[in-house]
Amino acid sequence: ASSLVGSEMCIRDRFEATDARGAFPCFDEPQFKIEWQVTMSVPVGDVALTNTPPEETTAKGGFETTRFMRTKPMPSYLIALAVGPFDFVPVEDTSTPCRIVTPKDKAWMAKDAAENTPPILAALEDYFGRPYPYRKLDLIAVPEFNPGAMENVGLITYRETILLLDPETATVAQKRTLSAVNAHEIAHQWYGNLVTMEWWDDLWLNESFASWMGDKITQQVFPEFGMDITTVRGNEGAKNSDTSAAVHAIRAPVMSNAVFESMDATITYSKGQAVLEMFENFVGEELFREGVRNYINQNEWGSAVAADLLENLSESSGVDFHTAMGTFLDQPGVPDVSVTPLGDGKVELAQSRFQFLDQDLQQEMPWQVPVVLKYSDGSQVREHRVMLTEPSEVIELPGGADPEWIHPNSNETGYYRWDVGPEKLLEMVAVAQETFTPRERVAMVEQVSAQMRAGRITGGDYLEATTVLLNDEHPEVVNTALGNLGEVRMAFVTAELMPAFRAWVRQSVGPLVERYGLTPQEGEDESVSLVRPSLIAWMGNWGADPEVRAFASEVTEAYLADRQSVDGSIAGPCLRIAAIEGDWRLYNTFKKEYEAASVPAERQRFLSALGRFQDWSMQEAALDFTLSGELRPQ
């Protein structure tokens, strides 16, 4: 992938999986890890960067030639080259030299990245029990960069929109994304770089682990961002993708670059992450970490396959990971665990492959499901762990008495759907807020939707349950319910039903707007600022609420006059709502502001709003602009 800004800057990276051979001769496969030495000649005044620090620089004929230090053993796809008039922001308190690298005159937007990198790096070094393995760590913001980021050894590339934030207007959502992506990419320096998968069928050894570790470290270092809630939402998204008839397994044969490019990221990243979290929770954090450390230490600077990791985890935990985790790695699909109380403390657990109505998906083999039941015996809430290895098993809960209730997936750390029957499910929804954790309630939103799509509850039951969950006290439960309703709206709400749907939105979402307010309040919880944009969008767009639309117009005028006068979290939804009833004057203003904006988030806001004008001639103009070649990728 190349990135060009005028004639000033060039980035050549993202060689994964087979593009390095187009840049230089090499054995372009991940198993070939060698030491590389890069030499670059660039015009005087430009700066050359690669994976290692410079070793020697000479000047001749208007060019500077820099020979860089030899790398540690690494595969070809992790090489990166950058040339340009960069600005540098030093990052303090790190174990290795570290900088944020920006395009010229954009260093002022690197403050958040420079501040959150040291604690992330320190937490990762602590987890692995060993220091960062390379000579330097440069984090570079790349304009016109298609991937979110790329974990090149010592020179990690990021989209500008992720790495560069306006310190005065950056939102909680932006800061959370920066932290999570940063933790993911730095985690790759161990997972994927220090130890590399031998072939692309084990890409999960890179991406599943970096996703799991990135979210884990973000939650540890920045608990205010509620990354554990974001994680469970990602897990639920993976379950939805994993219910497709055409889905592949986490480990799948990769015979060509076309197959590699077509792999479903929600499986390789999110499902793999969820499976790792499930097994870590089942065997315990310390035993799991011991296995991970042994895997890294035994395979450092080399390549590995899944069996290497599974053997280390088996040895540290005493659990047969080859068999148990193998049932999740090597077949597609989501286990569906049904829980049926039999009396006298006995419970029947049964497993099958979860599927939606009218699907006929086959299960290749029984899963070995690490089930963690959560139940109340009347005096206290208990957990009971069981490895479900058969199609059905009868277990006995400690104590021998029938529980008041059973949650089949304690804290939703397991990668499986569950079924307690429609009546019990609706009873659980009714008492969810006072009984279950925020993670469990967020997942319950998705559980209710999945049960409807499987034909186990009616559409009326779904709306009744969703209305209850919409009134949850935790903003992230509300946000999840709104997102889920968006999918239902697209599937079921026709033009004829739209007036009734708008009335339902105003009735159901309106009280939430009153609860949280349209404008941010000083000292409010971060989760409130995450849900407010969704509430504004729903009321202004699908609710067509006149008060919210008037508010959005006022905010838009204020934002156009002074960016600092409007909280960044509400600017985007207000611009989009204002566009719904906007005229050509507003359309041209948004287009002009988009073209002039230097802050990545501002460009995104105006560009998104350009697509929301309802007049057909404006929609046609927006489409023409998109296809004209004038539109930058970011």
Identify the residue ranges that each predicted region occupies.
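Single conserved hydrophobic/aromatic residue that forms the stacking wall/gate
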Residues: 1-6, 11
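Hydrophobic helix-coil surface modules that form long, contiguous segments used
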Residues: 12-20, 25-183, 211-215, 248, ...
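Short coil-to-beta strand junction motifs in C2/discoidin
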Residues: 32, 361-369
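Short polybasic amphipathic segments
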Residues: 38, 369-374
